[in-house]
Amino acid sequence: TCFAEHSFFIALALAKAHHKAFKLYIPETRPYLQGAHLTAPAAAEMGYETALITDGMPAHFMGAGRINKYITASDLALLDGTIVNKVGTLENAICAKYYNIPYYATSLGADINKKNRQDIVVEYRDPNWVKEIQGVKITSSSVGALYPCFDVIDSSLVTKIITPEGPLCIKAQ
């Protein structure tokens, strides 16, 4: 099996092969902290300048003009241009659209069995993950929590879906 970040790292490797240099602002990606534990260290090991930021900071850096492209992996891509990715992606995509920043999603390919967002069921995971960080409780046990693990990003927010074979041709619905 592979995880969504493979497509992201393929894109980084191709950019590196074409001598592209840029700084990466990488959100920590709560609650599992994949950005902090996986993405940022791997990008730094590839030689990219990286800045680890909290999940709430992308809007700040987009508004300040320090982010000029928004690029993510995707857990799922549809032929209509819909993207499914980690929770937090939707708010960043909306913010990118607001600041006229292109949003590129990397994908290993489209799921031809799903036609549109109505075919997607967003999984909710254990809400206790939101109430702790790496096993340390950060709030009272009397506080409720919700943990949808994926966002569904509308095609109107996506500039292009990039696959190893090239850009995915998005079909209008």
Regions found by a protein language model. Give the residues of each.
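Gly/Ser/Thr-rich loops at beta-strand to alpha-helix junctions
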Residues: T1-F8, P31-Y32
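Short helix-capping segments at alpha-helix termini
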Residues: A17-A21, E45-Y48
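Histidine-anchored nucleotide/phosphate-binding helix
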Residues: E5-H19, A93
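Conserved phosphate- and dinucleotide-binding cores of soluble alpha/beta proteins
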Residues: P27-Q173
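Short beta-strand element of Class I
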Residues: L24
